[in-house]
Amino acid sequence: MIILGIESSCDDTSVALLDCSPKGHFVLSEKIASQIDIHKKYGGVVPEIAGRAHAEKIVPLIEAVLKGQPHPDAIAVTYGPGLITGLLVGVEAARTLSYALDIPLVGINHIEGHIYSVEVEKKIEY
């Protein structure tokens, strides 16, 4: 199964295409747009500025990740917790693509994503 992942909960816009099979999970393509330089002068992340930067970057990142790759079978997107402006950009981009491509959309909790990300490297026995 090919999954398009979208993450925009704070100050980075991240998009990745994953091949998830019984043999493992493989990153086919990934792009990240950092906002560190944008927020540096403010001493922290400014939610409104972050949201605008996500809106500017998300479509070009999705296009770049999908270029020359297989079409996704599903889309996974961070729905929270996080900064509402960034989350709205990511969720609406994911919803639009899901509708246009007629593929499933799965919401991912940001904190749970961190917890389960350790399984990318090594399967955890429960």
What are these regions (language model features)?
Residues 1-126:
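Short acidic/glycine-rich loops and adjacent helix/strand connectors
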